[in-house]
C-alpha cells in the first residue's frame, strides 16, 4: 500500500495490520469525516489504483466496512451510508449500558491493579495534551476504557466492545483533533472526568460511578459538534489544496 499524502488514519497504529485493514481504516476515517459523502459509490478498481494495491485487499476492506453498516455492498459497487447523529448516539447508548455493567462487576473485584493501570494511562493522556498530540490522546482515551472493559474478563462484553471500536475510535480521533484546535481548554474537563472514573472504581462508590459515566456519555451533542468542526476543517483544507 503506497503512502498517500493525505492519510487521515495514523500510520503508526497500523504496524501489524493487513493491507485490507489498512485500507478499511483509511476509508472509514474519510467516510466518518465526510470527505467521502453519503451516497457515493466506491469502485474497487479506482480504490485499488488510489492505494496502489490489488483488488483483493480492497474487497477485504469493503467487507469490513459493510459489516460496520457504514457502506452497503451492491452489484454496481459499494454505496456509502455514513454515520448519522442518531447512530452516534446509539453507540454511546451501548457504551453506557456496557460500562455500567462492567462497573457493577468491579464492585465485587479486587481493583488495585486496574487502578494502577488506569492511573498510568491518565498520565499519558495528560502528557499528550501538554504536547498537543490529539492522536496520542485519542489512543490513550480508547485504551483507558478498553482497559476497564477487559478487566472483568467477560468474553461477550469484549466482543461488543471490539465490534464498536473501529467506528468509535475513528469518531473519537476526528473529534479530538477538532477539539484540540477549537476547544483546547475543554481537555481539562475530559481529564477531570477520567480522574472521577478512577476514583469511582477505587472507592467502589456506585453513585460516583454513575456520575462519572453520565458525565462522559451524556454530551453526545457536543461530540457531534466536534465531528462537524472536524468536517469543516477538512473541507477547508481540501479547498485550499485545490486552489
Swiss-Prot record:
What Gene3D superfamilies does the annotation carry? GntR ligand-binding domain-like, Winged helix-like DNA-binding domain superfamily/Winged helix DNA-binding domain
> What is any one GO biological process for this UniProt entry?
D-gluconate metabolic process
According to the UniProt entry, its GO molecular function terms are: DNA binding; DNA-binding transcription factor activity
Which intervals hold domain HTH gntR-type? Answer: 17-83
Q: Where are the transmembrane segments?
A: none
A Pfam match: FCD
For this protein, the DNA-binding region equals: 44-63
Tell me, in a sentence or two, what this protein's role is.
Transcriptional repressor of the gluconate operon (gntRKPZ), which encodes the proteins for gluconate utilization. Represses mRNA synthesis by binding to the gnt operator; the binding is suppressed by gluconate or glucono-delta-lactone.
Recorded protein name is Gluconate operon transcriptional repressor
Organism this protein belongs to: Bacillus licheniformis
Lineage of producing organism: Bacteria, Bacillati, Bacillota, Bacilli, Bacillales
Amino acid at each position: 500500500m503506497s503512502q498517500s499524502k493525505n492519510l487521515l488514519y495514523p500510520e503508526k497504529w497500523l504496524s501489524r495490520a493487513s493491507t485490507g485493514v489498512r485500507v478499511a481504516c483509511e476509508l472509514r476515517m474519510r467516510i466518518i469525516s465526510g470527505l467521502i459523502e453519503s451516497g457515493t459509490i466506491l469502485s474497487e478498481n479506482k480504490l485499488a489504483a488510489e492505494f496502489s494495491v490489488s483488488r483483493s485487499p480492497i474487497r477485504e476492506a469493503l467487507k469490513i466496512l459493510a459489516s460496520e453498516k457504514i457502506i452497503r455492498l451492491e452489484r454496481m459497487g459499494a454505496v456509502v451510508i455514513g454515520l448519522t447523529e442518531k447512530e452516534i448516539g446509539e453507540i454511546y447508548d451501548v457504551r453506557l449500558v456496557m460500562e455500567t455493567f462492567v462497573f457493577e462487576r468491579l464492585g465485587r473485584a479486587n481493583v488495585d491493579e486496574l487502578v494502577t493501570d488506569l492511573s498510568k494511562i491518565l498520565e499519558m493522556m495528560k502528557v499528550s495534551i501538554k504536547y498537543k498530540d490529539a492522536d496520542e490522546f485519542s489512543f490513550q482515551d480508547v485504551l483507558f476504557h478498553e482497559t476497564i472493559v477487559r478487566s472483568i474478563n467477560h468474553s461477550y462484553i469484549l466482543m461488543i466492545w471490539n465490534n464498536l471500536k473501529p467506528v468509535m475510535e475513528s469518531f473519537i480521533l476526528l473529534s479530538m483533533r477538532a477539539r484540540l484546535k477549537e476547544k483546547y481548554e475543554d481537555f481539562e474537563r475530559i481529564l477531570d472526568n477520567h480522574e472521577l472514573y478512577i476514583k469511582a472504581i477505587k472507592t467502589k462508590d456506585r453513585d460516583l460511578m454513575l456520575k462519572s459515566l453520565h458525565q462522559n456519555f451524556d454530551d453526545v451533542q457536543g461530540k457531534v459538534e466536534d465531528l462537524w468542526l472536524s468536517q469543516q476543517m477538512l473541507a477547508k483544507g481540501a479547498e485550499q489544496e485545490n486552489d
